Amino acid sequence: MIYQGENLSVDYIEPGIAHLVFNAKGSVNKLNLATLQSVGEAIDALYSQKDLQGLLLSSDKSAFIVGADITEFLGLFDIPTEELSDWLHQANAIFNRLEDIPVPTLSAITGFALGGGCECVLATDFRLADETASIGLPETQLGIMPGWGGSVRLPRLIGADPAMEVITTGKPKRAKDALALGMVDGVVSRETLITDSVTMLKKAIEGQLDWQSRRTQKKAPLKLSPLEAAMSFNVAKGMIMKMAGKHYPAPMTAVKSIENSAFMDRDAALEVENKNFVALTQTDVAKSLVGIFLNDQLVKSKAKQAIKNSEPVTSAAVLGAGIMGGGIAYQSASKGVPVLMKDIAQQSLDLGMSEASKLLNKQLERGRLSGLKMAKVLSSITPSLNYASIENKDIVVEAVVENPKVKAAVLAEVENEVNEHAILASNTSTIPISLLAKSLKRPENFCGMHFFNPVHRMPLVEVIRGEKTSQQTIDRVVAYASQMGKTPIVINDCPGFFVNRVLFPYFAGFSLLLRDGGDYQQIDNVMEKEFGWPMGPAYLLDVVGIDTAHHAQAVMAQGFPERMAKNGRDVIDAMFESDRYGQKNGSGFYAYSIDRKGKPKKNIDESTAGIIATVTNTTQPYTSEQISARMMIPMINEVIRCLDEGIIASPAEADMALVYGLGFPPFKGGVFRYLDAIGLTTYLDMAKEFEHLGAVYQVPESIKQKAADDECYYPAPQSLSAPSA
């Protein structure tokens, strides 16, 4: 044994050929701080081997290395920048020593080689992959860029243009695509990966493969003329500005880093990468995007626990077809859970099946599923005008019209048809679950299961716990949502649950802003371009449906009269009374036409101003800062109240629900990450300016206390000193 560490070992696989195997105790290999230190120690041990002729790197798991340990990132970002820069120098010295070892080196890649794992294999002379390999540098998706030589070695290996595409998109390449780009030198079967790798290394040792010229290429400047460089980098920067925009600086920073180091050798180029990596770690964007990743892991870990605690759902039913019912049925069937779709109208069943067929056809056209698979999914959706076979279903999702009396009647009816262990779930968006449960004999088997529209695109499912809902029911519905490929978050019952409860104060802020003379187009522009929402409030209301919003607004006002009761007629009333329902009937705040792809196209409607004029007496200019504040304060206050009341369990789950359910700007990380970033005192000062506007602008006492105690919503990252490498 040449070296034995906790996460890797090195020994000879054949005379003269050393084999470094990543073999962490867990299910995957991560290039965490401890493993990186072990890599350095192992390489030091290899340098002392007089009989060494070649080095092979591999993993004993189904993935090579899934990346760095992201749980360590926020702690690293928090250390002084000089210390972080020094540590990066030490880490890169390890990869440089791997690259400079005076024998040929090869990485045998199975499964994921991402982030630091990819940077590790880039430091070897050759890379051989099996068919399962997936190789990439996803750092820009976390608001940073490669920091262990990835932005230096990859452009020199495969060329600037393809390297910039790999780095700026953050999307990994499958084995065959990586081979076409030159990221790997061959693709072989998993069974022969190690033996083929040894054979390839022997060829390099014997001089049949020129490993030294390959190494020289990676350490030299890019082979670009000044004109080629100017064209390449200018085109890349233009595309990045269009793709990523101003809110996500990492892709542009990565391109500029590659550009500025293009004519440098490896060591000088690594200095440029170091400087840019450190700068990105200090941005709120990086902290927010890393925070989202960690929050997502928390939510998934809770779902995994629920899956362990429950039996998998093997058959389901949906009550109420149409577009929503069809979407739920499609999602269930496409993930392997057969579904009965029941409705009282044949026309609705036809619409539901049409929706499922349409979604499957799109998958077929894009090559994401075969005709055979499409037929199998469609055949596992059974449309029915009666309850035949429903007694065998594990779970029944009710998705009928959003009316409490209708829903209660349908739920009571179906409860008599199902077996006593079956779970009933309502897809209501606003009606309290405990209210609907009053019509049931077994309320412990009932909960909310709120999907978002369109079902196939929106990742969030709110699983709502009523007063009498059992934990067993919650666990099984969370497990079913996970089976469907969704992200379930458990919410305690209240009108609107979490997402809609916090959305309607935001709409109230919009109505008040229009009442006070704001311009809806400017508001949309500010909330989209400046704050970062995918849609401004007027456009969002059009997409949701102004009739739907009008009804939900009344439900919310009844549930929270002290804050959400309207003080007179507002713009949503005015639009509703004018039959301006939004995209669904072609006219809302905007007018809609159908483009060549069959999608609604937004156009300015000159008549909208006249309708808005009926609920305002003035026109008044507002700054972007005033608009953002007036729009966001009501939502932020309501989010805080939901946490205070235990409607949502943690800041992490609240932020994920906002990002996944509403499209809250990921670069801001969610409401609680945003509050921590700007500072609670700063928020209180901002809110104080608008407290005269009414109850939705009154900040909860809890945030005042937190600010007084100098606290944050998220715990401070674990303190790390610059690790020794």
Curated annotation (Swiss-Prot):
Residues 311-725 are annotated as: 3-hydroxyacyl-CoA dehydrogenase. The active site is at H450. One of its GO terms (cellular component) is fatty acid beta-oxidation multienzyme complex. InterPro entries: 3-OHacyl-CoA_DH_CS, 3-OHacyl-CoA_DH_NAD-bd, 3HC_DH_C, 6-PGluconate_DH-like_C_sf, ClpP/crotonase-like_dom_sf, Enoyl-CoA_hyd/isom_CS, Enoyl-CoA_hydra/iso, FA_oxidation_alpha_subunit. Pfam families: 3HCDH, 3HCDH_N, ECH_1. It catalyses: a (3S)-3-hydroxyacyl-CoA + NAD(+) = a 3-oxoacyl-CoA + NADH + H(+); a (3S)-3-hydroxyacyl-CoA = a (2E)-enoyl-CoA + H2O; a 4-saturated-(3S)-3-hydroxyacyl-CoA = a (3E)-enoyl-CoA + H2O; (3S)-3-hydroxybutanoyl-CoA = (3R)-3-hydroxybutanoyl-CoA. Its EC number is 4.2.1.17, 5.1.2.3, 5.3.3.8, 1.1.1.35. Residues 1-189 are annotated as: Enoyl-CoA hydratase/isomerase. NAD(+) binds at M324, D343, V400, V401, E402, K407, S429, N453. The record marks E119, E139 as: Important for catalytic activity. In the N-terminal section; belongs to the enoyl-CoA hydratase/isomerase family. In the C-terminal section; belongs to the 3-hydroxyacyl-CoA dehydrogenase family. This is Fatty acid oxidation complex subunit alpha. It comes from Aliivibrio fischeri (strain ATCC 700601 / ES114). The gene is fadB.
